[in-house]
C-alpha cells in the first residue's frame, strides 16, 4: 500500500466525516480545525519543563502532528526555548506505534531506549512507547482506567509535577 497522509489531512478528513454524520454546518470546519492551533499546556507544564531543562535533561516532542503545527504550538506557548527537538512522524512517513518513529530520538542522540522517559496522556501512545523499550509514563489527569492493552506503564502520574519525584 505505502500510502501516507499527514496528520492535518487525516484530521480534516475525519472532521468532514463527523460533521456530515452529526449534521454540523460545513462552514464551521475551518473554525474547528483552527482550535488545534490554539491549544494551551496545563498550568504546571511550563514550570516543570523549565525545571527539567535546568537539570540538563534533553526535552523533546515525538508526535504524529505535522512539523508546522507542532512548531506553531510550541512557539505560541513560548516553549520554543525549552524543547531541544520536535520529532514528527512526517520525517519517516509512518504513524506511531511503528518503531521507525521511536527510533528517531535514539538515532539522533545515540542513546539507549531505556534512557528515554516517554510521557503521554494517551494509553495507546504509552503502550507503543513502552513496547518499543522506552520508560513510559502515563499522565492520567482524570483518574481513568488504562485501556486493555498488552502493556502497563512503568509509572502513572496525575500531573507533570509528579514527574519531578520519579526521575
Q: Would you name each region that the model predicts?
A:
Residues 1-30:
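A metal-dependent, Asp-based hydrolase signature
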Residues 38-39, 95:
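Transmembrane alpha-helical core positions of polytopic small-molecule transporters
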Residues 50, 62, 66-67, 71-167:
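Asp-based, Mg2+/Mn2+-dependent phosphohydrolase catalytic module
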Amino acid at each position: 500500500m505505502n500510502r501516507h497522509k499527514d496528520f492535518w489531512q487525516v484530521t480534516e478528513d475525519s472532521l468532514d466525516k463527523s460533521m456530515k454524520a452529526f449534521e454540523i454546518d460545513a462552514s464551521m470546519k475551518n473554525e474547528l480545525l483552527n482550535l488545534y492551533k490554539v491549544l494551551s499546556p496545563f498550568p504546571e507544564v511550563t514550570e516543570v519543563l523549565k525545571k527539567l531543562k535546568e537539570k540538563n535533561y534533553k526535552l523533546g516532542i515525538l508526535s504524529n502532528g505535522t512539523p508546522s503545527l507542532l512548531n506553531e504550538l510550541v512557539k505560541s506557548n513560548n516553549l520554543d526555548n525549552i524543547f531541544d527537538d520536535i520529532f514528527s512522524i512526517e520525517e519517516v512517513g509512518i504513524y506511531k506505534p511503528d518503531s521507525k518513529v521511536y527510533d528517531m530520538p535514539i538515532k539522533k542522540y545515540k542513546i539507549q531506549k531505556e534512557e528515554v522517559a516517554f510521557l503521554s496522556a494517551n494509553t495507546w501512545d504509552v503502550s507503543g512507547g513502552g513496547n518499543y523499550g522506552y520508560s513510559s509514563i502515563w499522565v492520567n489527569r482524570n483518574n481513568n482506567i488504562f485501556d486493555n492493552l498488552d502493556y502497563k506503564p512503568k509509572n502513572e502520574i496525575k500531573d507533570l509535577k509528579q514527574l519531578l519525584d520519579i526521575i
